[in-house]
Amino acid sequence: MFQGASALTLDAKGRMSVPSRYREALQGQAEGRVTVTKHPDGCLLLFPRPEWEVFRAKIAALPMDAHWWRRIFLGNAMDVDLDSAGRILVSPELRMAAGLEKEVMLLGMGSHFELWDAQTYTAKEQAAMAQGMPEALKNFTF
């Protein structure tokens, strides 16, 4: 179970150091193997390989009228391995798709992660908060 936000930096080669609190879980759950793909909200999704296989099967089973969504998620997916320093390489294509340059935010989302350009994430978070809580959360007690 992944949760929490981490402000990180991509190096000149597009490598990102995975926070140590996640490395052990990724090694145990997926032998350090992850899959990275594009998300239409403007971020990247990072899945431990076993979770990716579950997600991939759901996407592959979508009806024909969702073929573009299959292309978005499956056609842009790249398998990567944690290196010996605990980093993953984010491909130039995926960095460009999500507008990632140097400063990024890694968000634990339960079974997977989202990777955002830090400025984009801050702007979208502020916009969401300005809109107020959605109906589904109005009766939710904290």
Curated annotation (Swiss-Prot):
GO terms for molecular function: DNA-binding transcription factor activity; transcription cis-regulatory region binding. The keyword Ligase does not apply. It is found in: Cytoplasm, Nucleoid. InterPro entries: MraZ, MraZ_C, MraZ_dom, MraZ_N, MraZ_sf, SpoVT-AbrB_dom, SpoVT-AbrB_sf. Residues 5-51, 77-120 form the SpoVT-AbrB domain. One of its GO terms (cellular component) is cytoplasm. Pfam families: MraZ. Keywords: Cytoplasm, DNA-binding, Repeat, Transcription, Transcription regulation. The keyword Amino-acid biosynthesis does not apply. CDD domains: MraZ_C, MraZ_N. Gene3D superfamilies: Transcriptional regulator MraZ domain. One of its GO terms (biological process) is negative regulation of DNA-templated transcription initiation. SUPFAM superfamilies: AbrB/MazE/MraZ-like. Belongs to the MraZ family. Forms oligomers. This is Transcriptional regulator MraZ. The gene is mraZ.
